[in-house]
Amino acid sequence: MADSIKVICDTLGGPIRVAMGTPLSDVAARLTPGRYPFLAAFVNNRIKELNYKIYTPVTVRFVDITDFAGIRVYQRTSWFILQKAARTLFPGHTLHIRHSMGQSGFYCELEGLDEFTHEQAAALEGHMLSLIHI
């Protein structure tokens, strides 16, 4: 393989060779699927998204939702989707993600709204799902 680089994949348990510029998603596709999909990977101990391309020899460890880093990736992604949906449905209002409510989620406020109804919550959830095409 011309211009190939060595990737030490902790998830695989050994090294593999890939072409320069290979995205992490392609490396992940070589792995036996686990119970949960991979959300990101540590590349030389730094968290990277799956479209990150590899150009030098690296050590990779993929993470899923069972890993603390995977939970954080999932949370941040959910926050971006929530922000996008809130801006679309409630223009002129600012969504604030205030603090953690333990394993129940996060406390949020929409600035400028005195009341947030069940119908508005359902519309927000529906728009979030449409953004990710579910």
Placement of each model-derived feature along the sequence:
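Conserved small/polar residues in nucleotide/adenosyl-binding loops
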Residues: 132-134
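Glycine- and Gly-Pro-enriched alpha-helical subdomains that act as flexible
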Residues: 116-120
